[in-house]
Each structure stands twice: as C-alpha cells, then as structure tokens.
C-alpha cells in the first residue's frame, strides 16, 4: 500500500533474485521513498527492473518525482519505458532512439522501449539495438498489458539462465530479441481478454 514505510520491509531470503518496481507506487510518499530504499538496499544482490509507467495525473510534486526516478534509474539493471514515458522524461524534438540512448548514458542497463502497435525495441549495454513487432491480436482490454509484457521478458530471461546482474550486462541481441518476442506474445494474450488476466505459461505456444 501507499503507506508502507522502510520499517515495514522484511529481510529478503536468498531465493529472491529479482525485484520489479513501477507504476503509481513511485508517485506518493511514504511508499515511493520506501520502494526506492528497497531498490538501493538490494541492488548489489538482486536484478532490479523498473517500469515507471508515468501517469502525470498522479504526480503531486514533479521535482521530487523526477529526483526519485533518477535515483532508482541509477540502480536499475533493466529499464522499460513506453514512448509516452520517454517523451515526458526527455521533452524535445530529438528522435525517440536518441532519447533512449540519452537515458541509458552512463549506465550498464538494458533499456526497453515499447511503442504500442509499433512493437518494442531494446538498447543493450554494448550499444546493440534490437526490435520486434507485435503479434496480431484482437484487443478487448489493455489493462495489464504492460505488466504482462514485463513479466514475459523476465520469465524468458530466467528460463535462459540470463536473469543475473552479470548475464544482463553481457546480453546479446539474439537473446534479447527472444525475450522481447516472448513478452509481446504473452501481452497479446492479455489484451485479448477482459480485465488484467495474463496467460499461464502452458497457454503460450513455443514457451
């Protein structure tokens, strides 16, 4: 909940290897500062994925929010933004991949960009740029699509023994392409259903 504080945080057990942060949980204190503290506390041990999923209507203090995002960007291993997120983070006329590279600058992070029906791209730590298209889908409800995409990417990396801090820094284009494709595939199932209703793995072909 939004009232969680650092004293509420438990010690993480060794089997927890990845933490995912995002959405409106980063907008309001004390929860937002608590989640930032957790990311900073665990960054040496866990893979950190961030999807800010920026919702300007929920932001009550833009300066503080931008500062908080910068701090969690600094400890994240995988940063996923939408084209709309990126335009909010880096306003201006530069092309979208230049903005993604600007956001990545100085970090050893995998940057993922989702562009709705135009697919998804990733910029790897070595500068490799990969892109995938979105599989055909009958859109019923887009609620949960982004979270499902992110879960699919993480699940695929985990299945390939690539969900470690060292492995992420050494990801190759072919491996990232497969992860993006799996994320897009599971998200396509979610949008074809009413509500936030992601698929089970056995529902996904070639999983």
Predicted regions and their residues:
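Conserved phosphate-binding/catalytic region of the ribokinase-like
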Residues: 92-207
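Ribokinase/PfkB-type carbohydrate-kinase core domain
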Residues: 1-130, 162, 204
């Amino acid at each position: 909940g939004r009232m969680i504080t650092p004293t509420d945080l438990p010690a993480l057990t060794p089997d927890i290897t990845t933490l995912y942060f995002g959405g409106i949980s980063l907008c309001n204190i004390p929860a937002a500062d608590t989640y930032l503290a957790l990311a900073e506390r665990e960054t040496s041990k866990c893979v950190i994925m961030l999807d800010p999923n920026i919702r300007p209507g929920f932001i009550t203090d833009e300066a503080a929010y931008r500062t908080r995002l910068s701090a969690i960007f600094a400890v994240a291993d995988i940063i996923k933004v939408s084209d709309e997120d990126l335009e909010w983070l880096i306003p201006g006329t530069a092309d979208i991949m230049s903005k993604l590279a600007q956001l990545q600058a100085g970090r050893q992070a995998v940057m993922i960009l989702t562009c709705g029906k135009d697919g998804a791209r990733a910029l790897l730590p070595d500068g490799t740029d990969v892109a995938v298209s979105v599989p055909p889908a009958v859109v019923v409800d887009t609620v949960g699509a982004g979270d499902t995409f992110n879960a699919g990417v993480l699940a695929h990396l985990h299945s390939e023994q690539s969900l470690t801090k060292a492995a992420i820094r050494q990801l190759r284009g072919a491996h990232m392409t497969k992860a993006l494709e799996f994320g897009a595939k599971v998200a396509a199932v979610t949008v074809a259903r009413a509500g936030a209703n992601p698929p089970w793995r056995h529902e996904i072909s070639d999983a």
